[in-house]
């Protein structure tokens, strides 16, 4: 599994990164990043919607990089320009439907960042043949009201290996430097997390000790189609977290002791 880290992280972590993402407002640092991290792909990301790029500079970056440069964009017009210039790119927003995925494939993206519900149909996503990236620490990214994020996108560190067949890059979104570094250690190095799952997954507001959750839960989530929100009867995610709820475990143990 490849890991993408933001350029603001310390040198200790950037040396381990497969990809380093830098905001366009800091694009003057791209040359330094090429030199300091010769094994990493440098991703230049739009800082603001509608931001104007200096395409002459970007052409230079791409030429010097020799296959280690890419753009992360939010605007289709800019994506079309990048395609015309032969510069690798992908759209930074999460893809939720197969219709979007097909359109982006036809556009010529180098990656797609996926979100629910297609996150729960990994075999179908794989069939499109487009490299996939996932922000593993965010249960949902829209501003719609949600109960708790239980039926959202979350990947346990222990189960990251199950996604290697489907996902090419893990990244971390919307967190401070110290938390992103901690998440890298947890997912890439320790590969386990004993505490509450909601402590490492943003927008997951439901208790459950991660060490008590069985890997079979993830095996079920890979291709379940998120039928739980389509009128289906599946409650696996809720049951898994309920069985890992420390208060419920304590109450169960106390009840057993009283027998």
Enumerate the predicted regions with their spans:
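Active-site pocket-lining/capping segments in soluble small-molecule metabolic enzymes
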Residues: 1-259
């Amino acid at each position: 599994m490849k890991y993408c880290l933001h350029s603001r992280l310390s040198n200790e972590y950037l040396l381990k990164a497969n990809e380093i993402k830098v905001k366009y407002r800091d694009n003057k640092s791209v040359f330094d990043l090429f030199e300091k991290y010769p094994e990493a792909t440098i991703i230049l990301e739009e800082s603001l919607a509608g931001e104007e790029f200096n395409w002459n500079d970007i052409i230079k970056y791409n030429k010097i990089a020799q296959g280690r440069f890419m753009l992360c964009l939010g605007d289709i017009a800019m994506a079309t320009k990048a395609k015309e210039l032969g510069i690798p790119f992908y759209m930074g927003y999460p893809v939720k439907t197969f219709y979007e995925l097909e359109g982006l494939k036809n556009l010529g993206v180098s990656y797609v960042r996926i979100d629910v519900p297609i996150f729960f149909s990994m075999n179908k996503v794989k069939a499109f043949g487009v490299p996939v990236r996932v922000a593993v620490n965010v249960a949902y990214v829209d501003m719609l009201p949600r109960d708790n994020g239980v039926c959202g996108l979350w990947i346990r560190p222990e189960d990251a290996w199950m996604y290697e067949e489907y996902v090419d890059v893990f990244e971390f979104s919307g967190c401070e430097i110290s938390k992103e570094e901690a998440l890298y250690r947890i997912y890439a190095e320790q590969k386990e997390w004993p505490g509450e799952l909601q402590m490492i997954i943003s927008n997951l507001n439901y208790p459950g000790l991660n060490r008590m959750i069985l890997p079979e839960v993830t095996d079920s989530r890979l291709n379940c189609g998120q039928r739980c929100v389509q009128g289906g009867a599946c409650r696996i995610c809720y049951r898994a977290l309920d069985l890992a709820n420390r208060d419920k475990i304590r109450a169960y143990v106390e009840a057993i002791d009283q027998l």
